[in-house]
């Protein structure tokens, strides 16, 4: 399904609106979007997801911008899978940060005829986060649209599913646990960057978005998707690979194939093989070859 991405909105008529940051588009977000999709079906109005074009903390705390589970293209891909019709990227700047919540809602209403708004239980908006579920509900009553506040999604143990918890799991190397909360295996998209690929070696240097949350330093079994083909591989993440303007990781191929420099690839995390042991030089290279053989066994390629 194709998702329409809107960056310069104009009045388009009736819409059901889903509000949120949707980082990672995890199981909690999925619950919210399915509620919004149900309302879209009931009202006949298309579903528009309204989210900011960047995380508010990029503006509010520019020295400490947060790592993200998903870039805008990754987010849009997942939302299309969940059958959203449109995603509107609202520019977030200092002026937006200082906007009163009532004005924010007025701006939304000026762009569409709102049939319903769906938001999460802890969604806040407007100056100092003053906008909340109560204010949304009052605005809906005043202007004649339906409001649904979606309760938190929880694990079987009762833990609230959140983007921050998933980031924490990834930072501890818990790939499989993070996948359970996401509802899918964590993915990273990037570009083949290293000349190693041109030399026919079985190691690819992948360059990724600088804000992308990577799993803890170590090695992981993964799937490497290039176009229409998917192959088992091994991911190696290490702090020494990270320059300032982008993030990098190494992909150890498990067969004799290679990839061209500049090719777009998609890496899907499967499971942790080994956390970093602080090795370097020859010891690290030998250990990585051992890890590669372990990955081959995981994919039954030994």
Q: What does each model-identified segment do?
A:
Residues 8-71:
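N-terminal catalytic cores of NTP/NDP-binding nucleotidyl/phosphoryl-transfer enzymes
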């Amino acid at each position: 399904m194709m998702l329409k991405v809107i960056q310069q909105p104009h009045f388009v008529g009736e819409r059901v609106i889903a509000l949120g940051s949707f980082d990672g588009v995890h199981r909690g977000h999925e619950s919210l979007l399915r509620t919004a999709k149900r309302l879209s079906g009931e009202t006949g109005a298309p579903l528009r997801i309204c989210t900011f074009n960047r995380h508010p903390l990029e503006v509010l705390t520019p020295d400490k911008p947060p790592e993200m589970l998903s870039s805008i293209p990754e987010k849009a891909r997942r939302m299309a899978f969940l059958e959203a019709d449109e995603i509107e990227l609202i520019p977030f700047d200092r002026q937006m940060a200082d906007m009163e919540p009532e004005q924010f809602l007025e701006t939304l209403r000026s762009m569409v005829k709102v049939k319903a708004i769906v938001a999460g239980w802890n969604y806040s908006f407007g100056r100092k986060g003053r906008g909340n579920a109560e204010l949304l509900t009052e605005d809906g009553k005043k202007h004649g649209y339906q409001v649904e506040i979606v309760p938190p999604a929880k694990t079987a143990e009762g833990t609230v599913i959140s983007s921050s918890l998933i980031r924490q799991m990834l930072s501890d190397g818990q790939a499989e646990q993070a996948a359970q909360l996401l509802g899918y295996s964590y993915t990273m998209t990037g570009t083949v960057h290293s000349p190693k690929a041109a030399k026919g070696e079985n190691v690819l240097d992948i360059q990724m978005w600088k804000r992308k949350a990577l799993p803890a330093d170590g090695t992981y079994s993964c799937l490497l998707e290039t176009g229409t083909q998917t192959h088992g591989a091994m991911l190696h993440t290490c702090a020494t690979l990270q320059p300032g303007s982008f993030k990098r990781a190494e992909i150890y191929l498990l067969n004799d194939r290679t990839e061209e420099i500049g090719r777009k690839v998609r890496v899907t995390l499967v499971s942790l093989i080994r956390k970093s042991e602080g090795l370097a030089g020859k010891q690290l290279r030998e250990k990585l070859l051992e890890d590669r053989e372990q990955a081959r066994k995981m994919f039954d390629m030994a």
